[in-house]
């Protein structure tokens, strides 16, 4: 690999009550293990939440490398709404959020839907954490580009969650997280690959090579989880809200 490579990996099928993995989630993580072994990340970071840590442990068990826990990789804690009706940012109904043009811009957090919420504050926590991590690995965020202070070919694995993955991608690309949250789905144990491109010396940008790849599940006839998705047709007997 001739660039810095980020592997953003969602946890396995979750048992949210126990903050762990279901039996299916453990199977998914073990199938992911073979793939991670080939990718051979130099550095492994994990969310502090149990379902992500368990996935990281199972998926990297053959590597024998330290797993470093980063608090900002936990699931995104920003909430929209008010009073008793505050809820996660990525379950908004299409008719409720798409009417706000501002949510499609890089000033999305100034939109009326976000006013009076903790979303911008929580977003900035993730952004600061990500920038600090990338700086340690030789890439300093500067506006919408990255200054290369120490070019390298490191592969970094981030075991985390769907909501925060969208925030990470949003910050790397300087775009709103709202389309990522609502129009993309990173299924359980999916791998998103992001790499640097340094076309001019000392100046880099990030490019997504693949999003939500679950080929390790298909290769082993493991049915993908429905977690984070909604019904395809209204009359389907799958999740509506």
Labelled PLM ranges:
Residues 64-137:
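Phosphate-handling substructures
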Residues 38, 61, 139, 199-200:
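Secondary-structure boundary motif
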Residues 12, 162, 212-214:
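Active-site metal-binding loops of divalent metal-dependent hydrolases
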Residues 2-74:
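Active-site-proximal alpha-helix that buttresses catalytic centers in soluble enzyme cores
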Residues 2, 76-89, 144-155, 167-241:
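Acidic, low-complexity terminal tails and accessory targeting/binding regions
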Residues 42-48, 146, 155-158:
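Short glycine-rich phosphate-binding loop at a beta-alpha junction
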Residues 131-150:
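Alpha/beta-hydrolase fold catalytic core
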Residues 30, 50-54, 124, 128, ...:
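A structural signal for well-ordered alpha-helical segments within the folded catalytic domains
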